[in-house]
């Protein structure tokens, strides 16, 4: 999935999401092109986080369409009973799509029950499908560059 200038990176069309019958996102559409900066502003409880969670495939939409770099991640389908639902791409396709974006969480924390090493190698193993041996080698190199080799087996609460 290559990016070109002016290319549409993300499209969300007529997105719907509800929790326990409470409509949180109702017919939301947006397009983000390469180079654009987008702000999502609204009061607490207005659906900002839910929209972002749907856009990044952390939350499943109830309806609508989600497209990354021209590749459909989810699209609205009507079943034989007339119910509208989202049909998602295969796990393999979603894996490729997820590699197109990154997330920075507002309250970033390490997993407290993982060692430093496990925190570092978890994403490469599960997201990039890197072998454990390769992930550990990369992590050891990174820790050495940072002067933290002695902290590989420490837990987050043990770090200053």
Regions found by a protein language model. Name each.
Residues 41-43:
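The feature captures the beta-strand-to-loop junction immediately N-terminal to the Walker
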Residues 1-16:
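ABC-family P-loop ATPase nucleotide-binding domain
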Residues 56:
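Helix-to-loop junction immediately C-terminal to a conserved catalytic motif
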Residues 154-160:
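Conserved ABC ATPase signature
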Residues 114-122:
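Short coil-to-helix segment of the ABC ATPase nucleotide-binding domain corresponding to the Q-loop/switch region
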Residues 71-75, 81-88, 132-151:
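Conserved ABC ATPase "signature" region
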């Amino acid at each position: 999935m290559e990016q070109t200038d002016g290319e549409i990176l993300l499209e969300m069309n007529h997105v719907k999401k509800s929790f326990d019958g409470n409509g949180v996102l109702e017919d939301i559409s947006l397009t983000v092109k390469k180079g654009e900066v987008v702000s999502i502003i609204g009061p607490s409880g207005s659906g900002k986080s839910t929209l972002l969670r749907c856009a990044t495939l952390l939350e499943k939409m109830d309806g609508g369409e989600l497209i990354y770099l021209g590749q459909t991640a989810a699209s609205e389908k009507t079943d034989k009973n007339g119910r509208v639902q989202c049909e998602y791409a295969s796990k393999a396709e979603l894996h490729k799509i997820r590699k197109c974006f990154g997330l920075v969480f507002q309250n970033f924390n390490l997993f407290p029950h993982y060692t430093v090493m496990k925190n570092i190698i978890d994403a490469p193993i599960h997201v990039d499908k890197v072998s454990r041996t390769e992930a550990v080698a990369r992590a050891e190199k990174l820790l050495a560059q940072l002067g933290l080799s002695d902290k590989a087996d420490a837990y987050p609460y043990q770090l200053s």
